[in-house]
Amino acid sequence: MNLLCRDESCSVYQMKNETGDGTATYYEVYPGVGVMYNDFHMEHCPSRKFEQNTHTFAIHHCREGRVEWEVSNGAYLYLASGDIMLDSSATENNHCSFPVSHYHGITITISVPEAVEGLGDLLSLFSIDLEQIEQQFALKARPFIMHGKSVPDHVISELYQVPDNIRLEYLRVKILELLVTLRT
């Protein structure tokens, strides 16, 4: 993945291979919390890898197209339009593909120790316990997928139509809202 540009609010990365190209636009919303807008028109790309020994989980949302991940033991996970997947650094992602060579979605990454340290009071104010969310969805054992429409889908869908002049503030509010909805 090559860095195309970076400014005070975001970094834009490009990926190219023989099957097409894609971009990922990354915003650091809070310490340890990032939002990445993914736009891919290719058949496959390298899988995302968390650094070893990290305590991180991710929330993936598919807006359009389809994405598949090959995980351990030859099993596959897929997301289609409206689907959400939660996974953790414990998930082994071996291969990522786009069966229809088209994928638009969002990935939210949360480094639990970094987020708790930087946002402890704010998380407490909203009764958000990141480790409890991990336990609720058993993310250390396996990914969790929500197919179709759900309350979290509604919250994430609002992230696709944000005016640039309020993007960072809006993302901050919506990430907190999303984490509150995951508690239910």
Regions found by a protein language model. Give the residues of each.
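N-terminal functional module of multi-domain proteins
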Residues: 2-104
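Alpha-helical bundle regulatory/interaction domains
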Residues: 70-184
